[in-house]
Amino acid sequence: DPIRDIEIINVELIMSDLEIIQNRIGKIAKKCESSKDKKDLFELETLRKCEEALLQNKSLRRVDLNEDELLLLKSFCLITLKPIIYMANVSEDDAIIGHNQYTDKVREYASNENSSVIVVSAKMESELAEMNDDDKKAFLEEIGISNSGLDKLIYATYDLLGLQTFFTSGKDECRAWTFRKGMKAPEWCAGIIHSDFQRGFIKAEVMSFEDLKEYGSELKVKEAGKMRLEGKDYLMQDGDIVYFRFNV
């Protein structure tokens, strides 16, 4: 019973969070009796809201918390507040289909907390790990699957954490860089590579991976007018290929 297994683990995590919350409540409640400070009162109210949910065996990610409450709770590193992905290990046949009666139950359970479920066959993944890229691609096409379970997990994890990728290319190497959605080109993305890029940012020369894939070369992308010059307010997009212009 996968739901039973999930709940056994969740109870342990809930008890861990409950201990942290109740220890803090014991301290802040005494302080609130004398100070009546608004920040302390807000903290106490938020912690008691969490305590009530945990006592009902409810993970904190299932509790409706606003931005201020989430910001306050961030410092406590509460496990059940963290986003989660459920991975269901199934047979090879069920992995090809994409579900079975048990994964359907897990998906229903996960939907109540806005979590996702990745269905994989550990046996199949082990076999794929031994293949080269061409053999792996041919095998997946033969069984009608676009991505391996491991690839699906990576994509889901990136999405869950709000991460995306941009690329840089030079004479010696091509590199992928991870950034958070909503980052601006000079503000953070250039700085990921080197602080000088951020400090002396002038412009970003940008083309998309999809355009490069379609036209076949950087020159043809430029000829098609798909290469762009972006300034300091440009929000980086997933799959951007970037040449940073800077001067320090």
Specify the residue positions occupied by each region the protein language model found.
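Conserved P-loop NTPase nucleotide-binding/switch module
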Residues: 1-14
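C-terminal-of-GTPase-core extension/linker across diverse P-loop GTPases
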Residues: 22, 27-237, 242-248
